[in-house]
């Protein structure tokens, strides 16, 4: 049995398969998931697991070069935006409109759906390298 890092086998496999600049998405329960993109559905009820809890676990196990968020999060969910900025200090941040954000999700290796039910609690994580 694995002792550290991501225990979910689907998430662990996706993280292990990422190459430089590949992307994964951590999403609230309302973000549409495009056909053809791997869906890892963790949502068990509203709020569980939370977006920030899942982000923390994934970020601890992934080299992240860049973060993309919908610019609407700034005015519509400032608390989540602030927490993301506090948790992810090193990567570059990019803000795009929500429609562009949804277009970018079509290229993701996987979308991890949480139980989060607050506006624009979604992030695209761009894989970096460990060297």
From Swiss-Prot:
It catalyses: beta-D-ribopyranose = beta-D-ribofuranose. Its EC number is 5.4.99.62. Its main location: cytoplasm. The active site is at residue 20. Keywords: Carbohydrate metabolism, Cytoplasm, Isomerase. It comes from the Bacteria. InterPro entries: D-ribose_pyranase, RbsD-like_sf, RbsD_FucU. Belongs to the RbsD / FucU family. RbsD subfamily. Homodecamer. HAMAP family: D_rib_pyranase. This is D-ribose pyranase. The lineage of its organism: Bacteria, Bacillati, Bacillota, Bacilli, Bacillales.
